[in-house]
Every structure is written in structure tokens, then in C-alpha cells.
Amino acid sequence: MEKIFSSSDFDFFTPGLSELELPLAGEIACGFPSPADDFLQESLDVNKLLVRHPDATFYAVARGTSLAPLVQPGSILVIDRSLEWSSDLLACCFIDGEFTAKWIEKSGDKIRLIPLNPDFPTLEYSPEEAEIYIWGIVTSIINNNVRLSRLQ
């Protein structure tokens, strides 16, 4: 990955699109336990899984907690700039010179930016109040900071 830009909320990178196929061990039960597979089924290339439009895809490393617990500081957001935005998508937005990621919702002539963390307010803007640019749509979130104890 090559760093291309930093803001107060994100570091942006271009994806490294080298192929790396890893063994896919089949499915794992997250409900009731199931018998384990006795063999590996196939392989998986993470870039092919996460990047649908290579020329329009960027990674951003999150800072801040407005999307916690889904997105934590250090989470990697996969952002596709080729996708059209619509309400109820997680978007990377550029507002008054800063990037932020929030769920977006159009309400009349206003745009609402909705955090997941209840400690943060929903932001609502009309075209007169702020210049908002939907920079891209978050298509995947990579959390490499999984805690080994249960979430509380």
C-alpha cells in the first residue's frame, strides 16, 4: 500500500494489488457448532474479494470512535469511488476541508451524517450550511485489532 493523503480522521492508501492466494478452510459456525471440514476447500485472494474496481478503490486507516464498535481506531476502510451513493450507505465524506465516514441519509434538501456510536451527534447539513462531497462508499471494513476477550 502507498500512502497518498492524511487528514485528521484518516490516512489514505492506494491498494497493493498483488495476488496472494491463501487457503480457505471452509465455513466456521458462529451459531451452533458443526462438524469440522477434513480438508481445505479452495483458495482465497483477499484483493479479489475486497476490490471490485481497482482504479477507483482506496484504503483508509480510521482514527476516532464515531463508528465504534464496528470501526475502531486502526480499522481499515475499503472505499470505492466508482459507486453511486444513496441513503443508508456508509460513506467517506469530504466536509469543509475534512474527511469523515458516516452513514448518510438524504432528508428533503438536507443530508444527515449518522454515527454508530451514541456518544456522537447526528450531523445535518443543508447545501447553504456546508459543502459536502461524497468521496466514496465504504464497501468493506478490516478490523485487525480483535480482542481475545468478549466485548463488554
Mark where each language-model region is.
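Short, positionally conserved secondary-structure boundary motifs
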Residues: 1-67, 140-152
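Short, hydrophobic/aromatic-rich segments at coil-to-beta transitions
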Residues: 57, 86-90
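Short, compositionally biased
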Residues: 65-68, 89-101, 105-111
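Short, well-ordered loop/turn sites that connect or cap secondary structure elements
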Residues: 71, 84-85
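Structural motif
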Residues: 74-76, 89
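Hydrophobic beta-strand signal
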Residues: 78-79, 92
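Glycine- and charge-enriched low-complexity intrinsically disordered segments
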Residues: 106-152
